[in-house]
Amino acid sequence: MGKLKLKLNIDISKVLATQGGKQAMLVIDDSAIARKTLSRNLEYYGFEVIEADAGIAGLKLFLERQREIAIVILDMVLEDVQGEVVLAKLQQLDPEVKVVVCTESASTEFKQTGQKVAGVLRKPIATDRLLKVIHLALGGSAADVEA
């Protein structure tokens, strides 16, 4: 993995090296187009991506592969279960889990009801914004991210 070239001075491999061997991203989104686009963008920059097309499927994959997952990218609007429920369950399974939540509507506010998230993304997701949020969520320095 090399340095990213999108207005960023980030070496993602260095940030991932601090994650105790966790290298994968779990993407939970019931929209196939959104999920595949996000996955392709992440894979392009060297991330291993695990995909789930529903909240329950995402929770099962998290349970099975928790040791590999550095971060979860969670769509808050899912057909099978509300994103807030999935978030709460992920945090119950692993209180240290890093979750970036996604929403399609700019008017939709993510309400933190005792749940902490590592970042919030609005759809459609710009690649540079995605990478910045992941970098910061994984403990990367804000000084590495140009304004």
Positions of PLM-derived features:
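Acidic, metal-coordinating helix/loop segments flanking the phosphotransfer/catalytic sites
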Residues: 51-71
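A Lys-centered signature of the CheY-like receiver
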Residues: 123
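Active-site residues of response regulator receiver
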Residues: 75
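Two-component/phosphorelay signaling modules centered on CheY-like receiver
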Residues: 32-50
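The feature encodes the CheY-like receiver
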Residues: 79
